[in-house]
Amino acid sequence: YGLVGSEMCIRDRSKNLTLASLFAGLFMFMNPMGSEACTRAVYLGPDDMVVTGRTMDWKEDPQSNLYLFPRGVQRRGAISDNTIQWTSKYGSVVTAGYDIGTCDGMNEKGLVANLLFLTESSYFRPDDNRPVMGLSIWTQYVLDNFATVDEAVAELSKEVFRIDDPDLPNGAKSTLHLSISDASGNSAIFEYLNGNLVIHEGRECQVMTNSPTYDKQLTLNDYWQQIGGLVMLPGTNRASDRFVRASFYCLLYTSDAA
């Protein structure tokens, strides 16, 4: 198993980490190496424990570095004059990809954000004159400004900016989707499809992988739930199979915790 990197964010004072540790171990080793084979999952445990984990199975070293940002940092969405500006409300610790943008992080309120690859992502909308938000700082914008998933969904659903998506340093297209989770266990998935932002929100949004889009992942997962994970689970490293396995383990251990 080729695990390039992982992030585990624990937001709870509970001393009972046995189930969380078991879940994390299963999660990390169920994901064979792939070119863009990342998986994000949220464990909802006893005593309001919330654990968000993701793998970073990228085809090369993403040159990750950790940064600690305080409150009160002034930022711009892009170098363009037509951009949004803000001052960070919350401090955060983040992982940068290629040292040019925030891929993952958690702010001081327990909001976690994770960017994963999604081939179907399309940010372009014809004749779009909205202010620009660079894809490299989109995740940081969320961590800087919102304490909960509800807050983030309420603001991002207004679609007041457009996403600029330059190619990655290795020449790959920066087609990404974003997941967030908060200290209450709520989650949301954000995908830009044909220039429009599609949002899925709820505690049940515990898993995100890669292609296909989230709505199609749910349809495929429904099929496997009819079979039953204790009977058979799909075993390849395809994103849809990883989604099914992670969903099964999330449900299994969340049910045990309850």
Language-model features and meaning:
Residues 44-47, 107-109, 182-185, 191-196:
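Short acidic-glycine loop/turn motifs at beta-strand connectors
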Residues 35-51, 59, 65, 75-78, ...:
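C-terminus-biased signal that marks the final domain/tail of proteins
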Residues 126-161:
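Compact, glycine/acidic-enriched structural inserts
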Residues 36-130, 159, 163:
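A contiguous strand-loop segment
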Residues 20-30:
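Bacterial N-terminal signal peptides
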Residues 11-21:
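Bacterial N-terminal signal peptides that target proteins for export
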Residues 149-180:
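Secretory/export targeting leaders with adjacent low-complexity proregions
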Residues 1-10, 253-258:
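Single conserved hydrophobic/aromatic residue that forms the stacking wall/gate
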